[in-house]
Amino acid sequence: MYVAVKGGEKAIEAAHRLQEQLRRGDDSLPAIGVEQIEQQLGLAVDRVMTEGGIYDRELAALAIKQAGGDLVEAIFLLRAYRTTLPRLAVSEPLATENMRLERRISAVYKDLPGGQVLGPTYDYTHRLLDFALLAEGETPAAPQADEPLPESCAHVFELLGKQQLALAEQDDGSAPDDITRTPPVYPCSRSARLQQLVRGDEGFLLALGYATQRGYGRNHPFAGEIRTGYVSLEMVPEELGFALDIGEILLTECEMVNGFVDPQDRPPHFTRGYGLVFGRAERKAMAMALVDRALQSPEYGEGVAGPAQDEEFVLAHADNVEAAGFVSHLKLPHYVDFQAELELLKRLRQEFSERQEARDE
């Protein structure tokens, strides 16, 4: 057994060296730098930060480089590193209405206070390969706005609330759950639910959000507002007693205006779904908002008509790190388990043959 263990250890070390060589690629080409990944693969960095749970573009870019472009592996690396970090303080709630806007659109109001800002987007491209990029030419300078963007813009739901068309969601002052310290138990609070959706796999949530549009869940959404920009981060040191601005982070926020409900105890009103992610991960924010609203079905007395409305099904399977780990463990040796099933199968086949022979006699 000792020889087998040592042999396996050497094989694993060799496999790691091969993987490192594969990650590096052709040595005659310049190695891609972490700064290049951070600057030129920004959307990949945003996803890794969001699902990895750390706002650090350099670390996310490093994880992408180390993982050879495998974003799920990069998320795993960042999530593992996160567990080594101390918690120094808790910030104040983010005031996204004061976001320094880069992009802001609404599909429900053409004209809204603060205006619509397209910002950077792939929405109106023709999805044709740009072969000019092969020439690695200079990127044309981006146009500059004639006027500065407003420093603060009210949310669309705030406008709907003033017309009593939507309920205002007020902070009740209770401390939100923390899924990194207390494992969620289903059914869970909305704060725990939103935390799991933020860390959830984009593709999984996107598929569930799409399913709600195809009839697997009562959901008729409008993109009430999608905004991307920089939000100030504040904290209150105990020795000072007042808030200090310690920096800003880039966020994308999505609020979906969903089909109205007609409860017995209050006037009919629109419902909402909410998504908030690091960076410019707009598709993830939209998918998160769709699934958030679907998971509110029990609160509105709606039956479960699709998987997106099943809280435990969605939240227990959305984490790609956990899912990848469980699926990957199937690659580990299962010799004893397989031998047990093999022996059982042989015995059943023997019994079957004996019954066949007895029947023939």
Spell out what each predicted region is.
Residues 1-49, 99-119, 123:
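N-terminal, Lys/Arg-enriched amphipathic/low-complexity engagement segments
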Residues 2, 27, 60, 67, ...:
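Aromatic-enriched hydrophobic runs in primary sequence
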Residues 7-11, 33, 70, 201, ...:
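Intrinsic-disorder/low-complexity, polar/charged segments
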Residues 34-58, 63-89, 93:
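Hydrophobic alpha-helical segments, chiefly the membrane-spanning helices
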Residues 87, 92-149:
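Helix-turn-helix/homeodomain-like alpha-helical modules used for DNA recognition
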Residues 140-361:
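Acidic, serine/proline-rich low-complexity intrinsically disordered regions
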